[in-house]
Amino acid sequence: MEQNDKIQLFEDKRIRTAWDEEKEEWYFSIVDVCEVLSGTDNPRRYWSDLKRKLKSEGAVELYEKIVQLKMTAPDGKKRLTDVADTEQLLRIIQSIPSPKAEPFKLWLAQVGRERIEETIDPELTIDRALETYLKKGYTREWINQRLQAI
């Protein structure tokens, strides 16, 4: 797997990431995310305990999808670390009992509600797409062409 390492910052804390060119997917260091969202002094231990908890709760599929990639450690050496893609990471965040994780959980609930509404009324999908394109600065003409192509 070809990957490009990159550091992302969240509240001035580093989160190691890697882009997989082949799968066109981002991978995130789970230990880094646990450290940022839980505020723990021992993120490796926190992730180890959380893994055990997830496994005991039946989240075996999530546990099995986690892979390890070599990422640059704080000492500059490349070490294998557990990483998760976006979907897996969002699932892990739901399991972190911390006030810092609450904004993510609220956002996930909102997105889930919107997705259910769009399933019931597909026209909402078009309305939301229009609104998003306008916020991104696209012209109405471009948006209409894009929506007609769907």
Describe each model-derived feature in a short phrase.
Residues 1-150:
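An anion-engaging/catalytic patch
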